[in-house]
C-alpha cells in the first residue's frame, strides 16, 4: 500500500501539478522529521529521499498492524471487509492531514488543497481497501487453505 500511495502522489504532484520531482517528493516526507534540511542536494538529498521512503513505508506498516489487530478479527464477510477498508483508508487520510502532518516540521499543504478529494478517494481505494481485503484472507476465523499438522 505504501508503493501504490507513493505512485499516486507521484502522478498527481510530479506529472499533473509539476510541483515536485520524485526525489523532492520523498524529501518532503522526510522534512516532516528533519525540517527544511531534507531538501539538500547531492548525496545528502538522496539520503533524505531514502529516509522519506522509509518513513512512508513505516507509517504504512503501522496502519496495517493497527487494522490487523483491531479491525480484521471482527470482519466476517468480504463485503464487510471492503466497506471497513474503504472507511479505514478515508480515516487514515483524515488522521494524516489533521494530526500527523500538522505535528511535523515540514511546511504542509493546506487541509483543503486542490487535490484533497482525489487523495481522500485514493486512500480509501488504494490504501484501506487493499489492507482490508488482503488481511481478510488471513483472518483466522475462516478455514485455512494450509494443511494442518
Question: Across the structure, where does each feature detected by a protein language model lie?
Answer:
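Aromatic-anchored segments of alpha-helical transmembrane domains
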Residues: 2-7, 89-99
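Internal alpha-helical transmembrane segments of multi-pass membrane proteins
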Residues: 73-94
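Extracytosolic (periplasmic/ER-lumenal) interhelical loops and adjacent juxtamembrane/interface segments
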Residues: 14-47
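Hydrophobic cores of alpha-helical transmembrane segments in multi-pass inner/ER membrane proteins
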Residues: 122-136
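Short, charged juxtamembrane terminal tails flanking transmembrane helices
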Residues: 137-149
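Interfacial helix-loop-helix junctions of multi-pass membrane proteins
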Residues: 98-120
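N-terminal signal-anchor transmembrane alpha helix
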Residues: 1-19
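Hydrophobic alpha-helical transmembrane segments
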Residues: 50-68
Amino acid at each position: 500500500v505504501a508503493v501504490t500511495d507513493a505512485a499516486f502522489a507521484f502522478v498527481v504532484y510530479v506529472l499533473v501539478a509539476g510541483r515536485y520531482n520524485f526525489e523532492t517528493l520523498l524529501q518532503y516526507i522526510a522534512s516532516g522529521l528533519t525540517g527544511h534540511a531534507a531538501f539538500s542536494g547531492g548525496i545528502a538529498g538522496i539520503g533524505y529521499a531514502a529516509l522519506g521512503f522509509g518513513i512512508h513505508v513505516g507509517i504504512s506498516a503501522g496502519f496495517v498492524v493497527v487494522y490487523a489487530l483491531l479491525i480484521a478479527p471482527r470482519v466476517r464477510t468480504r463485503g464487510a471487509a471492503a466497506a471497513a477498508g474503504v472507511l479505514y483508508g478515508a480515516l487514515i487520510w483524515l488522521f494524516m492531514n489533521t494530526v500527523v502532518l500538522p505535528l511535523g516540521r515540514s511546511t504542509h499543504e493546506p487541509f483543503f488543497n486542490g487535490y484533497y478529494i482525489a487523495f481522500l478517494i485514493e486512500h480509501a481505494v488504494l490504501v484501506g481497501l487493499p489492507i482490508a481485503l488482503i488481511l481478510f484472507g488471513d483472518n483466522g476465523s475462516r478455514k485455512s487453505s494450509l494443511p494442518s499438522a
